[in-house]
C-alpha cells in the first residue's frame, strides 16, 4: 500500500465520523517567505504543502458545517476544518489565494480591536527585538536584566523570555511594560501587521467564515465577568458591523482550558448565542463549545498527516 492510501485508511480508523474524529487546524500567520529569525513559522510554501495533504487525505469542511454535522451525528470520516486566529493581514493577502486555488474553506477568528493599524502586544515585543539596532536590551525594569541580541539565537531566546514574563500580567500593566520595551529597543516598528476592515470584508466576500476572538485578545480568566462578557459581545458586534453578516463562532484567546478560560466563560459563549467555540487544547473532543484544535509542525507531508491522526487518539482537556 502506498503512503497516501495507507494514511487515508489510518485516518478513517481514528476519525470514523458520526460524532467523533473532527480535526481542526489552527494557524496564525502565513508569511510570504520563510522567516530567518523564526524558521518554524508557517510560510506560503509550507502552507501550500499542508493544504495539499488536507485536500488529499481529509474531507475538509467549513467549520460551521462540521459543527452542524457533529451535532447531528453525520460527520464524514476523516473530517477536518481549517481556522486562523487573531486577524493578521497575511491571512487575506497570502493564505486566502492558496485556499481559493484548492477550493478549501477556512474560518478566521479576528480580534477586532487590532484592525486598521493596530498591533498585538506580542508582535510589538517580537518586532522590537527583531529590528533593534542594538546588541543588548536593558530589561532591568522587568527584573530580567540585560538581554543579549547579537545573534539570531540570542534574539529568539530574548523573545521567548519576554513573552513568558509578560503573558499573564494585567492588561494595563503589560501595555505599559511593552511600550517601555519598544522605546528601549530604538526600533522603528512596522505598521500593517493586522488586517484592515476591507480585508475582513474581502475574506467574507470570498465565502470564508469570520469568527469572534474578543476585542483586545485578553486572557478571559484574568478579567471580571462583566468585562469578559463585554469583550466577547463587542468583538462579535464589531465584526458583524464590518461584514454585514452574522458572526456565529468564537475562539477563546490563548485558549488553554482551565487556565486561559473557565467554565463561566463557556456559559457566556452559550448565553451570547454563538453556535460553537474553539480552544487551543490538543486531542479529540466533541463539546461544541470547547472544540480542540491542533496543527502538526512536521515538514514531511506524511508525518504531518500521521501526527494529525495520532492527535485524535487521546481526549482533549476542557475547562469543565
Give residue ranges: language-model regions:
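CE4/NodB-like, metal-dependent polysaccharide N-deacetylase domain
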Residues: 25, 75-76, 88, 93-109, ...
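Short, catalytically relevant binding-site loops at active-site mouths
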Residues: 115, 216-218
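C-terminal active-site subregion of NodB/CE4 polysaccharide deacetylases
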Residues: 1-83, 90, 120-139, 205, ...
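Extended, charge-rich helix/loop segments that form flexible
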Residues: 15-19, 117-206
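Gly/lys/ser-thr-rich phosphate-binding loops in alpha/beta enzymes
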Residues: 82-130
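Residues within well-ordered alpha-helices
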Residues: 50, 95, 196-199, 265
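Short secondary-structure transition/capping segments
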Residues: 103-116, 150-164, 258-264, 286-302
Amino acid at each position: 500500500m502506498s503512503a497516501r492510501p495507507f494514511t487515508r485508511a489510518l485516518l478513517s480508523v481514528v476519525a470514523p465520523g458520526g460524532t467523533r474524529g473532527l480535526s481542526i487546524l489552527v494557524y496564525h500567520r502565513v508569511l510570504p517567505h520563510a522567516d530567518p529569525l523564526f524558521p518554524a513559522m508557517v510560510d506560503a510554501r509550507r502552507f501550500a504543502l499542508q493544504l495539499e495533504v488536507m485536500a488529499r487525505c481529509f474531507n475538509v469542511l467549513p467549520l460551521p458545517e462540521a459543527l452542524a454535522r457533529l451535532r447531528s451525528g453525520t460527520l464524514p470520516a476523516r473530517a477536518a476544518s481549517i481556522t486562523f486566529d487573531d486577524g493578521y493581514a497575511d491571512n487575506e493577502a497570502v493564505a486566502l489565494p492558496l485556499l481559493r486555488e484548492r477550493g478549501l474553506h477556512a474560518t478566521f477568528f479576528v480580534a477586532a480591536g487590532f484592525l486598521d493599524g493596530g498591533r498585538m502586544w506580542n508582535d510589538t515585543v517580537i518586532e522590537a527585538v527583531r529590528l533593534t539596532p542594538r546588541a543588548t536590551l536593558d530589561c532591568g525594569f522587568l527584573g530580567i536584566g540585560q538581554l543579549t541580541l547579537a545573534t539570531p539565537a540570542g534574539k529568539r531566546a530574548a523573545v521567548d523570555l519576554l513573552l513568558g514574563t509578560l503573558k499573564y500580567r494585567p492588561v494595563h500593566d503589560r501595555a505599559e511594560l511593552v511600550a517601555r520595551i519598544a522605546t528601549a529597543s530604538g526600533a522603528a516598528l512596522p505598521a500593517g501587521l493586522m488586517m484592515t476592515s476591507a480585508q475582513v470584508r474581502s475574506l467574507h466576500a470570498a465565502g470564508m467564515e469570520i469568527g469572534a476572538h474578543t476585542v483586545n485578545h485578553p486572557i478571559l480568566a484574568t478579567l471580571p465577568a462583566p468585562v469578559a462578557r463585554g469583550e466577547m459581545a463587542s468583538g462579535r458586534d464589531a465584526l458583524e458591523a464590518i461584514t454585514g453578516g452574522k458572526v456565529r463562532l468564537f475562539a477563546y484567546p490563548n485558549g488553554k482550558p482551565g487556565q486561559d478560560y473557565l467554565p463561566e466563560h463557556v456559559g457566556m459563549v452559550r448565553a451570547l448565542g454563538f453556535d460553537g467555540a474553539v480552544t487551543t487544547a490538543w486531542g479529540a473532543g466533541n463539546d461544541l463549545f470547547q472544540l480542540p484544535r491542533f496543527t502538526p509542525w512536521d515538514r514531511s507531508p506524511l508525518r504531518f498527516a500521521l501526527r494529525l491522526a495520532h492527535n485524535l487518539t487521546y481526549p482533549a482537556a476542557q475547562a469543565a
